[in-house]
Amino acid sequence: MERYNFKLIEDKWQKHWLKNKTFKSEIDKNKKKFYCLEMFPYPSGKIHMGHVRNYTIGDVLSRFKTLKNFNVLHPMGWDSFGMPAENAARQNNLSPKKWTEENIAVMKTQLKKLGLSIDWDREISTCSTEYYKHQQKIFLDLYDKGLVYRKESYVNWDPIDKTVLANEQVIDGKGWRSGALVERKKLNQWFFKISHFSEELLSNLNKLDHWPDKVKTMQKNWIGKSFGCEIDFNIEGSKNVQSIRCYTTRPDTLFGFSFLALSVDHPMSKHYENDNEFIKFKKECSKTGTTEESIAQAIKIGFKTELTAINPFDDNHKVPVYFANFVLMDYGFGAVFGCPAHDQRDFDFATKYNLEIKTVVKPDNENDKFQIKNEAFTGPGVIINSKFLNGFSVPNESIDQAIKILEERGLGKKKTNYRLKDWGISRQRYWGCPIPIAYDENNNVVKIPKKDLPVKLPENIDINTNGNPLDSQKEWQHLVIDGKKCKRETDTLDTFVDSSWYYLRFCSANNSLNEFDPEEINYWMPVDQYIGGVEHAILHLLYSRFFMRAINKNNEQIDLKEPFEGLFTQGMVCHETYKDQDNNWFNPDEVISDDGKNYYLIKDTSKKVIVG
């Protein structure tokens, strides 16, 4: 019996599918629709087994639904802007555009050889002007709705990639791509107002019945809803300031209060801007990133002021006021009260500066003489050493009672807070979507007229410069809008913006005039099955949920808030990986075993690779 010839059969049917557009998708209201989507790939040049596994899962599901007489949409595209293309272009002396387009051609050929049931007529690429002209329209629409704004703020600065990172892109205090220790830097930045939807993003997680619990928990923790209290601490030692307000989730530990810590950007800092010691301290603080991970890993340092803060529960209890590197201005009010016995960060700070450490919470199985020793006690228990709060259980009873007393005395009020910060979207790089904004001679924001979109990236540019290559493009920067001389914004958009709405563009990929076709979107959306990595839980997946709401708010014809009905996180393909000393990754066909020895070499250079 003749062996089954895979190649012959594959070639035959793939040609048939292509010629007859077997997988072309169109609206058919006589059938149930099924929108299957895998997270689209970054065109690195070659597909790997992770891609193959991901797209095979989607292919099997799409074919199954087709056999079940569903009308299936199964598209493919390319997440093609980003820093890696810029870096690779530098290394290979190519333009990012050429490097990206060549990689797309290679990967598309590879994907087609897999015989996937993809509607290639809906193919998109985020670096094409046909895609990003619509993204620029969306930006301007959201700006008009108040969901985009610009402000000066501290940002996470990657000193290797020389760009800003969102909090979600900082992992263990390091840049998610470069691995460099992140620094704090103050810049004018553009932001999406994702915090406007904090409660809705949180509460709607309960409706995502076909999402993994792990992903929902990660998003819940990232949004970080907390219940606490705003407290006004009276201040002594200042002629100009009578009180400082702070937000805390633990007002029940006020009797263990031993210092008040302020951000270096707190309004109080203006009184120290000519103090040389404070100037040096502030510069030292810039070495710490803006994420919780960066702050947690940093050595805690403080600058002591001549001020004292008064405990609202005890007028005779006065403590020093410090500026500290672990307090950020964008959380609460840029001020925190320190209770070293029951917060490890406060404990480290108090130990360093020899401040009082007073125990006010004991474990349930300890007596009232319990004292902490070498570390803070942060568990549940019972309040002690706290006068009228003694005996209340921690945390629920004690916190409620503390807030009640503060409100009765007019010293504080209950407050709900969210950990989720607005999404910083400015990036100091060339290979990204240009922001459709300019500035007049008085630095006022001027929108690029929609009739002049897209704002295209200049070509034939030298990208081997330090910092943002667009800053050197003077001719490109200067333009006239409504008779006014203006200068273009040189930052580009975070590439996560590109992937936050691509699932919508697939629905009307061939509509050149409009970014959305409401009829197509209302038919195909939401995505019935989304497939991709769990590593995107608090990045792409959260951003996409925000974007869907923002677009819904801007377009009354689109009645949808959740983009993905079902989510499957496929896991990792675990096998040997290969990289060199410079952290460049290699495919298996680019390395060889050195005659059976326990190491591999790069084919082209014979250099050793690290096997992981």
Please provide the spans of the model-predicted regions.
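Short, solvent-exposed turn/loop segments enriched in Gly/Ser/Thr/Pro and often Arg
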Residues: N30-K31, F40, P75-P84, E123-Y131, ...
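Active-site and channel-lining beta-strand-loop segments
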Residues: I231, R245, K304-V321, F326, ...
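Conserved catalytic alpha/beta cores of large enzymes that bind or transform nucleotide phosphates
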Residues: K282-E306, D315, V360-P363, F388-N396, ...
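Amphipathic alpha-helical
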Residues: I194-S226, F257, S263-G302, K451-L479
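Residue patterns forming the tRNA-binding/recognition surfaces of aminoacyl-tRNA synthetases
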Residues: R3, K12, H16-N20, Q91-I244, ...
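Conserved oxyanion/phosphate-binding beta-strand-loop segments in alpha/beta enzyme cores
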Residues: M1-L37, T66-P75, W99-K108, H210, ...
